[in-house]
From Swiss-Prot:
Enzyme class of the recorded protein, top EC level: transferase
Gene Ontology molecular function, alphabetical: 3'-5'-RNA exonuclease activity; magnesium ion binding; polyribonucleotide nucleotidyltransferase activity; RNA binding
The organism of origin for this protein: Brucella melitensis biotype 2 (strain ATCC 23457)
SUPFAM superfamilies: Eukaryotic type KH-domain (KH-domain type I), Nucleic acid-binding proteins, Ribonuclease PH domain 2-like, Ribosomal protein S5 domain 2-like
Name of the protein described by the UniProt record: Polyribonucleotide nucleotidyltransferase
């Protein structure tokens, strides 16, 4: 019934298996991939014909994690998977980026790649396996995909590169880098690092590229026996029509791209396009030599060509800068004084308002992953409203791009955050992009660094980011620093580098062509370093290190540690005690399983009151010390006094006063505040207290009585 084909190799010390022909046979391509004991199913379906009037390639990549893969049942009311998690969105983008440029130019059929995690061994992350499976499914599907590709994760542990470190090894690694590409070229890099130098980062990229070559060979081996017939798709030859359009628009476009102001430049480009449309689509003429879709494709292509020619021929860019100059930068902090920390970062026509908010442990984000539930104490949210580019558009929940850009900035800042023991706050940074003309994600990095320092978060060092571009024609190439929005799409390599003066904390690269050598990437990274250091210098004009004190409106958190066997005493039955402490003092209290207690309030007196209360519960009373207490019960033989948190002790009738007492209630009443001295414990461990040795007015010990007690004891 099944015509199955299977390829197995050893990769990174674990077996990798690719199998097709048994599951999802009605898809154009389907591959079940297993690495260790983690298993994913990748499927590809592509429409037989493009939709009429389609002028772009509608590729969708959906990566989905099923909770059954880790032996779990989803939480929530419906008990089933819902909208994609942040991680699912990020992995979908991770797979999309290297495969998208490998579809043949002009292919516009609706194409969907779906990757489902079926089993997770809690050791091998399914993201790399999903990329491999998607590549294999595309390669055997018959769609015009110029792959295969593969991917690999590279760690850096004890000065050595590690291929596909397992989940338990990652905390030890100074690098989390994912690289993807073909057998010939690197196409995509995504990483987080702990201030690593450029040569180590580039070495990791090349190590990863070399390490995944056996996987590409395995995919080719599978395709040789299982691939479907390639679709009969011939890209449309528009070269003759392009030459005709170029003759009409070249001068106008060259003049338009000399205009440095974005909106004026766009208007000039639109005017050039309208003029060409009048030429090729005269009013009243039905038969034209090209369709509107063909003209749109050609015009877009020519825009890129002319800008590329100008840069390579003259070394001058759209806005008049040379290749390595960064746009003018203005940094401001404290622009919203009632927030905990704020910054306005402006670089040319790109601008971000970033606001930092500090919270307590209650504000941490609970993340329910396949590997288990954990808390995240640092959140960075990136918002890109349509007005930032002078347009109208959809507002609402963040899209894939916003989630991806936010995570890139998160990776850049995260390695520089203080340890939880040093700074026990939950941190949320929100970046509002108010203007955009290239590299808003890197503006977010710079703005977040400024806002955190303004908030008093003791980050290790300031972090800055820069977006770079690269254009290559034959042997000629140009590396562009701080690219504009118009330069973002026409380059052969776009990459974003963030870090401190000492090293890289995040690197993202997207390479669209073959021929980008290691040497070219080295030049590009060195130029990016110069730009990053320049930006850090400009940021330092506003603030160069974290403020010594938190903002006026930020909560204060103090940490104390209690014995783990006392946690239940502080919480109380059903949370009764801790609720009372919170209600009476006004402070927020968070207790960890290891006995760490975080007490938060914007009022220092509330924190002290809560600390004192908790201390009274967990501390042991000391013999010879004097305590203030409350009479909770009277009896013929004495009074019971609550004197040390929930602790009670007996003041025997003989210890109530210096004179003889006939009746307990002659001296004390229930609810009365008294001073007592802890005399010791009886043979049953019961507390013995005395009032007569303490001045009930001042709470001071009566010295004469003290000496008498010492004599009596002898």
């Amino acid at each position: 019934m099944f015509n199955t084909h299977k390829v197995e190799i050893e990769w990174g010390g674990r077996p990798l298996t690719l199998e097709t022909g048994k599951i999802a046979r009605q898809a154009d391509g389907a591959v079940l991939a297993t690495y260790g004991e983690t298993a994913v199913l990748a499927t590809v379906v592509s429409a037989k014909e493009p939709k009429p009037g389609q002028d772009f390639f509608p590729l969708t990549v959906n990566y989905q994690e099923k909770t059954y893969a880790a032996g779990k049942i989803p939480g929530g009311y419906f008990k089933r998977e819902g909208r994609p998690s942040e991680n699912e969105t990020l992995v979908s983008r991770l797979i999309d980026r290297p495969i998208r440029p490998l579809f043949v130019d002009g292919y516009k059929n609706d194409t969907q790649v779906v990757i489902t995690v079926l089993q997770h061994d809690l050791e091998n992350n399914p993201d790399i396996l999903s990329m491999v499976a998607a590549s294999a499914a595309l390669t055997i599907s018959g769609v015009p995909f110029m792959g295969p590709i593969s991917g690999a994760r590279v760690g850096y542990i004890d000065g050595e590169y590690v291929l596909n470190p397992n989940i338990d090894e990652m905390p030890e690694s100074k690098l989390d880098l994912v690289v993807a590409g073909t057998s010939e070229a690197v196409l995509m890099v995504e990483s987080e690092a702990q201030e690593l130098p450029e040569d180590v980062m580039l070495g990791a990229v090349m190590f990863g590229h070399k390490s995944f070559q056996p996987v590409i060979d395995a995919i080719i081996k599978l395709a040789e026996v299982a691939a479907k017939e390639p679709r009969d798709f011939q890209p449309e030859d528009l070269s003759e029509l392009e030459a005709k359009v170029l003759a009409v628009v070249e001068n106008d476009l060259r003049e338009a791209y000399k205009i440095t102001e974005k909106q004026a430049r766009y208007a000039a480009v639109d005017a050039a396009k309208a003029k060409a449309e009048e030429h090729f689509f005269p009013e009243g003429v039905e038969e034209t030599e090209m369709s509107a879709e063909q003209f749109a494709t050609i015009f877009k292509h020519l825009q890129a060509k002319i800008v590329r020619w100008n840069i390579l021929d003259t070394g001058n860019r759209i806005d008049g800068r040379d290749l390595s100059t960064v746009r003018p930068i203005v940094s401001e902090v404290g622009i919203l004084p009632r927030t905990h920390g704020s910054a306005l970062f402006t670089r040319g026509e790109t601008q971000a308002i970033v606001v930092a908010t500090l919270g307590t442990g209650e504000d941490e984000q609970m993340i329910d992953a396949l590997t288990g539930t954990y808390k995240e104490s640092f959140m960075l949210h990136y918002n890109f409203p349509p007005y930032s580019v002078g347009e109208t558009g959809r507002m609402g929940s963040p899209g894939r791009r916003e989630i991806g850009h936010g995570k890139l900035a998160w990776r850049a800042i995260h390695p520089m955050l203080p340890a939880a023991e040093q700074f026990p706050y939950t941190i949320r940074a929100v970046s509002e992009i108010t203007e955009s003309n290239g590299s808003s994600s890197m503006a977010t990095v710079c703005g977040t660094s400024l806002a955190l320092m303004d908030a008093g978060v003791p980050i290790v060092r300031p972090v800055a980011g820069i977006a770079m571009g690269l254009i290559k024609e034959g042997e000629r190439f140009a590396v562009l620093s701080d690219i504009l929005g118009d330069e973002d799409h026409l380059g052969d390599m776009d990459f974003k580098v963030a870090g401190t003066e000492f090293g890289i904390t995040s690197l993202q690269m997207d390479i669209k062509i073959d021929g980008i050598t290691e040497e070219i990437m080295k030049v590009a990274l060195e130029q990016a370093k110069g730009g990053r250091v320049h930006i850090l210098g400009e940021m330092a004009k506003a603030i160069s290190s974290s403020r010594a004190e938190l903002g006026e409106f930020a909560p204060r958190i103090e940490v104390m540690n209690i014995p783990t066997d006392k946690i239940r005493d502080v919480i109380g039955s059903g949370g009764k005690v801790i609720r009372e402490i919170v209600e009476k003092t006004g402070a927020k209290i968070n207790i960890e399983d290891d006995g760490t207690v975080k007490i938060a309030s914007s009022n220092g007196k509330e924190i002290e009151a809560a600390k004192k209360w908790i201390h009274s519960i967990v501390a042991e009373p000391e013999v010879g010390e004097i305590y203030e207490g409350t009479v909770v019960k009277t009896a013929d033989f004495g009074a019971f006094v609550n004197f040390f948190g929930p602790r009670d002790g007996l003041v025997h009738i003989s210890q109530l006063a210096a004179d003889r007492v006939a009746k307990t209630t002659d001296v004390v009443k229930e609810g009365q505040k008294v001073w007592v001295k802890l005399m010791g414990f009886d043979e049953r461990g019961k507390v013995r207290l005395s009032m007569k040795v303490v001045d009930q007015e001042t709470g001071k010990e009566i010295v004469a009585e003290k000496k008498k007690e010492e004599v009596d004891a002898e």
